[in-house]
């Protein structure tokens, strides 16, 4: 999940592009690793509904309680602490949007509806903004290409691109308010506006060139219903602020918490991949090596890469595994393939080393 932002792929043009392109093009699939990964994890593919529901509901309870405290506490210090807790808990709850794109909805009955009611609509990120988008990122011949809505060659871009990439996420709550309080009503009235809104403003993506197609049939009905309910909430929220029902301070804290969630997610996105591919079609193994695991003993990924996102490379290897199965899958593969295996090459120690790596890469442009 990432906030939409525009960059020009031509910024990546340099002698390093050719080197990276040829390096990725040379990576063949490690069939032994792929077969081992599939064989060792066949019994881990079933999602456990009780884990999903308890995790989501607990995260929401903690997040909204902390948000209410941040809005009501008189002490600035305590309010900031409560706000930080709200950011982390609501970020965890929001991260389940990623699981929604992968699990069979019948396997965790009602979870999509529950997630939208608990977090998607209140935070103005209904699941249709990601469903139908993220699966394209996993398509075998799309990953890392201009057709991938969730990929940019960030490691090959100019140094200024990284602070812009992170900084833009600060405005996410404002952008979402405009999307649902302004653009959604206009789209309902004017078909030409709807065409633009669907294509350009209905996806959580980072590739500015991505243009979304409207779904059909029942999915389109579901999309319109979710959009309408979110729009009503966004308009009602602004109306309550304008009339004093919701204090301005509380509204600003809500926006600040939303910005905090978006920034953490954008930082997590920045280190989810190495971003070293400049448009070439990649093998599954190459995609795995362009992705990142941050396994134990690192502790902080529990906060900044929750709901299985710390095993992002493994997720690209086995996208069907539910998030709660990824730690066990990682342990099995690590034991079976050994310390010197290609599998271990996607494992990294922590956030700061990964950020330093991509910053150094952009400094070479």
Regions found by a protein language model. Give the residues of each.
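Cytosolic juxtamembrane regulatory segments of multi-pass membrane proteins
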Residues: 205-214, 287-303
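Residue-level signature of the transmembrane alpha-helical core
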Residues: 56, 60, 83-84, 88, ...
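Transmembrane alpha-helical segments that form the membrane-embedded catalytic/substrate-channel core
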Residues: 87-97, 126-130, 253-282
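Membrane-cytosol interface motif
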Residues: 113-119, 279-293
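Non-catalytic, topology-defining segments of multipass membrane proteins
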Residues: 1-86, 121-251, 323-365
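Histidine-centered catalytic micro-motifs
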Residues: 94-103, 130-142, 269-277, 306-321
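Aspartate-rich (DDxxD/NDxxD/DxxxD) Mg2+/diphosphate-binding motifs
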Residues: 95-114, 142-154
